[in-house]
Amino acid sequence: MAANEKMEVTVKTLDSQTRTFTVETEISVKDFKAHISSDVGISPEKQRLIYQGRVLQEDKKLKEYNVDGKVIHLVERAPPQTQPSTGGPSTSSSTSPTSSNAAPVPGAPERNGNSYVMVGTFNLPHVMSGLVRQQRPSVSTVNGNDGSTLDVHINLDQQLPVQSEPRVRLVLAQHILQDIQRILDRLEGQAVNEQAAEPMDTAESEGEASSRETLPQTTQNTDGQSNTTPTSHPSPSEYVEVLQSLSRVEERLAPFMQRYREILSSATSDAYENQEEREQSQRIINLVGESLRLLGNALVAVSDLRCNLSSASPRHLHVVRPMSHYSGPMLLQQAAIPIQINVGTTVTATGNGTHAGHMPSDGNAAQPPSTNTSEPQRPNTENQPPSNGERPASDAPPTSVPHPHPRVIRITHQTVEPVMMMHMNIQDSASGGPTTIPPPTAGHGGSAHIHMPGLPPEFMQAISHQITQQAMAAASGQQIPGFQAPPRFVFTRPAAPSFQFQPGTATTPPGPGGATTTVPGATVGPAGNASLAQMISGLVGQLLMHPVVVAQGGSSTSSSTSSSTFTSTSSSASSSSSTDTTSTTTTSSTANPTVSSVPSSQPPPGTDQHLSQLLGSLLGTASSGMSNITMGSPSITVTVPGMPAFLQGVTDILQATQTVPVSTAPTQSASQAPPPSSPPPPPAHSSPPPAAAPESLPPEFFTSVVQGVLSSMLGSLSAADQSGTESIAAFIQRLSGTHNIFQPDAEGPGGFFGDLLTLICHNFSLVDMVMLLHGHSQPLQNLQPQLRSFFLQEYLHQVDPTPNNIQMASRNLTNGLEEYIRESFASVTVRDDVDITRTNIEFLQDQFNRITTHILHCADSTFGQRLLEMCNQSLFEWLALNLYCLRGDQNALTSVINERIRRLSLDVSPVLVSWVTSVLSLRLQVLLGQMPVTEGEIQRHVRRVGDAPQVPEPSSQEQPMETMPVDCQNGAASPVLATHSGGVLFLPPQSSVPTICPDSDHPTQEDGGSEQWAASVPPEWVPVIRQDMQNQRKIKQQPPLSDAYLSGMPAKRRKTMQGEGPHLSLSEAVSRAMKATGAKPESSAECVRRELDNSEAQGRYREQLCQDIQKTLQDNESYSAQRFPNTQRAFRGDP
C-alpha cells in the first residue's frame, strides 16, 4: 500500500451533524482524534469514537476497523475521577447555572465527572448500601429544560415538603430561557462562556432562590417534632417575572427573526456564491430555529399555569394539565430493536443522613446563603442539590450538631447512540468542607460493597424507548387523546432492619398521629436490604417510564395527579458513627400529612406471603426474604397503565387472605442472598414452573398480573396491543420489521419442528408463554384442538393414531435429527464410553411417543396440565442426561443450546438472537442449579459405545410404509430413472410425503418395487440411495417450478427442485390450501377428508383441473409446444 493513499471517514456527532475527513490510511485512532478535535470542538481525551457498536482503541490504526467510506459516531466520554474522592471544599456550589446541552464552564466540574459504570453491572459504591437502608424515601421527577431529559429525585430520608408542579413549570421555563439566552449570545457575537453577563441571572435567582431556600429550611426538624411546613407553591408574581423574561427574550430575538424571514424568503432562488455569506445565513437559520423550538417549549411549560382569583389570599398558582398529560407513551413504528436514542436521562438520589457527626469548621454553615442563588434547581453540570445544613451562620449555633451533608448518587442514563452508562457521584458537592462517610460494616446490616441486580437488556431498551417518547412528547407539547393518569396499586414489602436498636424490638413507622409502636422478633441482617435493593432495581423502570412531578405519599386510593410514586414508611431509627463522636440514635416521629392510609402496624395476615410468591416469580426476588418477616412493611406504590383487572385482582387477593396465618419463620440469613432479577425466559425455550402453590393465585388473577407486568416492562414495545392478545409471531414480526418469519414455506427452520414452532407462535401470546413458564397450563388446554389436528396431519399424515403408527412416526422423525445432533455435540467433550448421538435419538423417540400419545388420546380437562408436566419432565431429563454425558460441564451444555439457536435464527435480528441466548443462559444456570433429576434416574437412557443396538422392528415396518394413491401407483412404484447431460439421477416418487399404512398386513410398494431399481444399480449404491430417499422424504418440499426454470438447471440442483405438480387428489389439495391460509374446518379434519375422497367429487376435480390447465395453455401466447413437450403430452385429450 502506498504511503500517500488516503481514506475518507465521515464522523457523526450527537447534534446529528456529519463531517467528512480525508486522512492517511496509516493514521492511528489517537492521531485521528487530534486531527478532528478542532472541527468537532471536543478535545481528543474526551472523544469516544464508535463504529458498529465497538469503541475504537487509540493504540490501533484507523484502517484496522475498515472505516474507509463509512460513518463513525463521536460522543463525549466521561473522564475518570476528575473530582476529589474524599473531602476538600467543593467548587461547584458557586458555579453559575449551566444547561446540560451547553458547553461546560471553564473551571466547573465536568458533567460526566467522577466514576461511572456501564449499564448491566450496577456495581455501585458502598454508599448505595446505605441509601437502600434509609427510611421514608420520597420521589419526584422533573422534565428537562428542553424536554429531552428527565430527572428523578429519590430522597431516602425524612419526607420533604412536596414541591408543587407549578414551581417546577416555572423553573423549567427559566432554564429554557437560559438556553435561549446562550443562543442569543452566540448570535450577537458574545462568548459562550460569559454567563455572568446574562440578564436572565437576576430573574432566575429571584425566582429560584426562594424555591431552593425553602426546600432545605423546611427540613430542619428537631427530633420528635412533626413537619407541618406547607407546600412551596409559587405566587403569581413569580409567574410575572418569568413572563417578563419571556418578553425580554422575544425582544432580543426580534431582529434575528427579521433576518430569518429574509433569508428564507430568498432561499429558493439565491445562488449563494459567497461561501462566507452562505455559512453565516445557515448559522442564523440553525440558531434561530433552535431558539424558536426552545421558546415554544417554554410557552408550553407555563401555558397550563392558572390562578384562582376566588380563593383566599395569599393566592398561588396551579396547573390545569399535569406534566404526564404531555408524556404519555407512544410507539415509534419506524424503529426496530436496537432503538438508538439521542436523549440523556439523569436520576438523582439524595439522602440526608444517618451519619450523625460534627461538620468541620469550614462547613457550609459558615457560608452565606447567597451561594445558593447561582445553583440550579435541576442538576445539570453540577447536578448537586443544596445541603440541608445550608443556612445563615446565625441559625447554626456552634454547640449544636447540624445535619450532615446529603449524599448524592446521580445515575446518568446517557443513551446517546448505542452508548449507555451510569454515573455515580457520591461526593459532597454542595458543601464547603469534607465530610466523613464511613463504609458500613457487616454488623450494620451491610457489606463494604453491594451488588445491585442488573436490569435485563430488554428492560433497559424498553425504559430507554419510553423515556424517548415522553421527552419527545413533552418537548413538542403533543397531547395524547384519551390519556388519563393510570391507577396505582400497592406492594407491601418487609422493612429494612435499622442500623442499631434494642435487642428483640424494632421501631415501626409512626401513624398519622405521630405515635410509634414496636414489634418484637425483628432481627438484623442484609436480607431486607438486598430485598429492597432488588425492588428499587425492579421498579426504577416504573419511575422512569411513568414520570411524576409531585411526590405524593398515600395508598392506592389516592387521587394525586402523580402517575407513579415510590414511598417507604419504614422506621427512621438509625445511627452511625464518625471519627470524633460516639454513636447516637435519632428517632424521628415525623409523619407526612399526605400519608393517611398506609398501615403503621402489622399488615393483614398472609399478605406478604402471597405477594412474595407473586413478586418472587415476576421480579426475581426471594420469597423467603419477604414472607418470613412480620415487622412493619414499607409500601411500594407503582403505576400500571390501564389495568383495572389487575387492581381488582390485588384487592381480591388481599381480601381473600385475611385468615391465612402469618409466617413466623426467621429472617433469611446473611449467607442466603436473594437471586438477581431476571426477565421471563424467551418463548423459544420451555422451562419448568417454580414450586408455587397454584391454588393461591387463580389463572384469571395471574393473567391480569402478567399483562400488567409485561405492559410495564415492555412499555411502548407492546403498545400496539394493550389487551395482551397479540401473538408471539405478530410481536416478533413487528419488532423485526419483516413479515415472513412465521409464514408457511418461509425460509428458516423447516420440517415438523418449524411447523410446530409456527403453530405455537401464532396461537400463543407473551402472556400465555409467561403463564406456562410459571406453571399455569390453561394456554395448552386452549390449544388442544389445534395440537391434535397438527399431529394427525404433520406427524402421522392422516393415519390412525395406533401405538404402532406413533412409534414408526417417532422413529422416522428422530432419525432425521441424527446429523443435527452429531454436529451440535462435535465441539464439546463427551464421556469416552457414551454414544451421545444414540443416547439423544432414542431418548427423543421415547419422549415423542409419550407426548404424541397423550396429545392424540387425552380428551379430558387434565390435558393441559399433564402435557405441561410431561414437557417439564422431558426437559429436566434431557438436561440431566446431556449434563451427565458432558462430564457435568454446564458451560458446554449452554454453548450447545445457544449454538443451535443461532443456527436456527440466521434470518432473525442478531440483537434479538443475542438477547435470547443471554437470557437463556441465565435461565439455564438457575434450572441446572435446582435440578430435580439425579444421575441414577437417567442412567436407563444412556447408550454406551459398543452396546448392541435395539432390535429393529420387522422389515415391513423398518421404513415408513408407502401406500401410494391408486392414481399414481404405477408411476411411483419405483423411482423414475431420468437422463440428462449431467448424468444419471434417481428421482423420488411423486408423493414424497410418507404415508403409514394402518393395516400391518398390507404389502408396501417400496418392498414390492425395491428389487427393480436395486438390480439396476451397483450393489454399493443401494444403501446410499436408500438413505438419500429417506432423507428427501423428510425435506419440506418447495412449490413447483416451471419447466422453463428447470430446463436451464443442472441435474444435481434439478433433482432437489422437483415439485409434486398439481395435486390430483382433492383431499390433499384442500388440506394444503387450508394449511397455507390458516383456515379451519367447521367439522373435524377426518370428516372433511372422507367427504373429499368421494369418487364422484374426485372425478369432477380431476376433470376441472385438466380443463383449467388446457385453457391456460391455449390462452398463453408465450406457450410453445416444442419447448414444453411434456406438458402437451400430459394434458392432451380428456382426463
Swiss-Prot record:
Residues 212-227, 367-387, 1116-1129 have a biased composition (Polar residues). It is found in: Cytoplasm, Cytosol; Nucleus; Secreted, Extracellular exosome. Residues 76-114, 194-238, 350-407, 498-522, 552-612, 661-698, 1075-1099, 1116-1135 are annotated as: Disordered. It comes from the Eukaryota. Its main location: cytoplasm. ATP-independent molecular chaperone preventing the aggregation of misfolded and hydrophobic patches-containing proteins. Functions as part of a cytosolic protein quality control complex, the bag6/bat3 complex, which maintains these client proteins in a soluble state and participates in their proper delivery to the endoplasmic reticulum or alternatively can promote their sorting to the proteasome where they undergo degradation. The bag6/bat3 complex is involved in the post-translational delivery of tail-anchored/type II transmembrane proteins to the endoplasmic reticulum membrane. When nuclear, may also act as a component of some chromatin regulator complex. This is Large proline-rich protein bag6-A. It comes from Xenopus laevis.
